[in-house]
Each structure stands twice: as C-alpha cells, then as structure tokens.
C-alpha cells in the first residue's frame, strides 16, 4: 500500500520519434558519433581521428569532377560464368543476389569529365560488390578506361579498393592482371600520366598488378596495402610484424608510395599535379 499519492503528474514523455536512418554514423576507429552533415562535409572521414570510411565510386566521382558533372561509360558489362563455378551457391546466383541487394552492377565503374578544368578519366573499384574482386568485367573496364584516356588525350586515375582476384572465375580472373598491366603501357607510349590511388584495402592480385604501376602512386591514410594479409603472413613466418606493417604510412617510408593524401585534399593535389605535367 502506497503511503503517498502523487498529486501532480510526472513529466509526460513526448511521442517517440523515429530517428532517420543514416542520420548518425559511428567511427570504426575511435567510436565517435558523427552527424550525417558533418560526415559528408569531411568527405566521409572522421572529424575526430581522421579515419577514412570506404566510399562508393559515385562519391569519388562527386569529389573529383567539377560541379559533380561526369559521363559514365561501359556500365552495361556483366560477369559471365566461364567455369560453371559453385560454392555455397552458383556464381551467377551470387552475382544476381549482390546486384539485387546492393543496387550495384559490378566492382568497378568508369567515368570521364573535367577536374580543375582539365579532362580526366577515372576508374573506381567498389569493395561493396563481392569484396571489390577483379574478374573479367573489372579487368575489361580498366582496359577500356585506358582506351578512353587515349581517345580523350587525358590522364587516367584508377582508384583501387579490392580484396584481390575473383576466385569464382579462376584463371580468367588472374589473366586480368597481365591484361591491365599490358594495356597501361599504351599510356606510357603516349606520354599520358597514370595515377594509382590505393584505398583500404588494396590487396592480392590488385596490388600485384596495375595498382603499383602508376607513374605516381598515392594512397589514403592508413589504407591496408599488400598481397597476403598480415594475419596470414604472421601465421606463416611465426614472427611479429613491424608496427603499421602494410599500412600506407609504412609503405611510404619504404618507398613504395609517393604520397599519402587526405581525401579532402585529393582533388586539389591531382589538379596541381596535372597542371605541373601540363596535361
């Protein structure tokens, strides 16, 4: 039995309102809560610690091209199933399900436009599509991006974001390493710059082929870059790895990279570079 009777009602809770989806983001590195506008204003990086989130090719296009104006090309290409590959599901079913779930058509997108008033061709990979893995379509798109650069007499920027070759296509996937590397020689013959931007992650057959062949090799901060992952290497050699091993800053110290560039400075750095090269 209660001894006291509440005379006045307590504070009445207001109607619960649903928070718009995607209004807040949590930093994967430091745990800070980031408001959507703040997140976008900082080019999808953490305002507290500078962590770079993975972003889609379209967001890179918006950052790089003047007034967000560009022309996408070769988006009609789709993966075939040359091996009839099956693991937990058939390869065509996996591709179809990924397209349905993500709304993306492949792990690479090509576009051309102007950056700083100068023509530029960009081929950007997407980790959100089967880990950004390189199969026949990705290799063909990068090769066609080279052809577009030759056609427009414009420099080429390739943005890598991939776990490596696409195992479901076997040797057809590995062939893309040689194919892309060979096609890039045409840019050298025409004296057109090829800039390779490595983002997190750039691994496996990507790092072992076109990603490391740039006239200028640059990276976003703390990007994981290598062939086998650090855990695999550690378990194989049974030794601890150096601090920061396979991270962008470590590779810069070892001479594998020319610059590590924050995403907010990417466009200005590229515009300055291309103006110095007069292309």
Swiss-Prot record:
| Protein family (similarity comment) | Belongs to the AccD/PCCB family.
Q: Which organism is it from?
A: Pelodictyon phaeoclathratiforme (strain DSM 5477 / BU-1)
Q: Which PROSITE patterns match?
A: COA_CT_NTER
Describe, by residue range, where the zinc fingers (C4-type) fall in the chain. Answer: 27-49
Q: Which HAMAP family does its entry note?
A: AcetylCoA_CT_beta
User: What catalytic reaction does the record list?
Assistant: N(6)-carboxybiotinyl-L-lysyl-[protein] + acetyl-CoA = N(6)-biotinyl-L-lysyl-[protein] + malonyl-CoA
- Provide the function of this protein: Component of the acetyl coenzyme A carboxylase (ACC) complex. Biotin carboxylase (BC) catalyzes the carboxylation of biotin on its carrier protein (BCCP) and then the CO(2) group is transferred by the transcarboxylase to acetyl-CoA to form malonyl-CoA.
- What quaternary structure, including any partners, is listed in this protein's UniProt entry? Acetyl-CoA carboxylase is a heterohexamer composed of biotin carboxyl carrier protein (AccB), biotin carboxylase (AccC) and two subunits each of ACCase subunit alpha (AccA) and ACCase subunit beta (AccD).
Q: Where in the cell is it found?
A: Cytoplasm
Its recorded name reads Acetyl-coenzyme A carboxylase carboxyl transferase subunit beta
* Entry EC number(s): 2.1.3.15
What cofactor does this one take?
Zn(2+)
Keywords of the record: ATP-binding, Cytoplasm, Fatty acid biosynthesis, Fatty acid metabolism, Lipid biosynthesis, Lipid metabolism, Metal-binding, Nucleotide-binding, Transferase, Zinc, Zinc-finger
**Cofactor, how bound (note):** Binds 1 zinc ion per subunit.
Q: What pathway is this protein said to act in by its record? A: Lipid metabolism; malonyl-CoA biosynthesis; malonyl-CoA from acetyl-CoA: step 1/1
Task: Please verify whether the record's keywords include Nucleus.
Answer: no
* Pfam families for this protein: Carboxyl_trans, Zn_ribbon_ACC
Q: Which residues bind Zn(2+)?
A: 27, 30, 46, 49
Q: Name one GO molecular function term.
A: ATP binding
Q: Name one GO biological process term.
A: fatty acid biosynthetic process
* Any Gene Ontology CC annotation: acetyl-CoA carboxylase complex
- According to the entry, every stretch annotated as the CoA carboxyltransferase N-terminal domain falls at 23-279
């Amino acid at each position: 039995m209660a001894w006291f009777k509440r005379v006045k009602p307590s504070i009445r809770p207001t109607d619960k309102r649903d928070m718009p989806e995607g209004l807040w983001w949590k930093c994967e590195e430091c745990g800070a809560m980031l408001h959507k506008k703040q997140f976008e204003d900082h080019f999808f990086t953490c305002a507290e610690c500078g962590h770079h989130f993975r972003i889609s090719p379209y967001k890179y296009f918006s950052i790089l091209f003047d007034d967000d104006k560009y022309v996408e090309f070769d988006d009609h290409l789709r993966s075939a199933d040359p091996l009839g590959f099956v693991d937990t599901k058939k390869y065509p079913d996996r591709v179809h399900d990924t397209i349905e779930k993500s709304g993306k058509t492949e792990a690479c997108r090509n576009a051309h436009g102007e950056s700083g008033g100068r023509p530029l061709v960009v081929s950007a990979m997407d980790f959100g599509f089967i880990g950004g893995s390189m199969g026949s379509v990705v290799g063909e798109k990068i090769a066609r991006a080279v052809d577009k650069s030759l056609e427009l007499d414009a420099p080429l920027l390739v943005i890598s974001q991939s776990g490596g070759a696409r195992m479901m296509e076997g040797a057809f996937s590995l062939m893309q390493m040689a194919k892309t590397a060979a096609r890039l020689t045409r840019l050298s013959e025409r004296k057109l710059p090829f800039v390779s931007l490595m983002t997190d992650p750039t691994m496996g057959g990507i790092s072992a082929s076109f990603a490391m062949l740039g006239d200028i090799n640059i990276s976003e901060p703390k990007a994981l870059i290598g062939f086998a992952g650090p855990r695999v290497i550690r378990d194989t050699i049974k030794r601890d790895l150096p601090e920061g091993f396979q991270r962008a800053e470590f590779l810069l110290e070892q001479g594998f990279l020319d610059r590590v560039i924050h995403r907010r400075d990417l466009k200005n750095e590229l515009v300055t570079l291309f103006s110095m090269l007069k292309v």
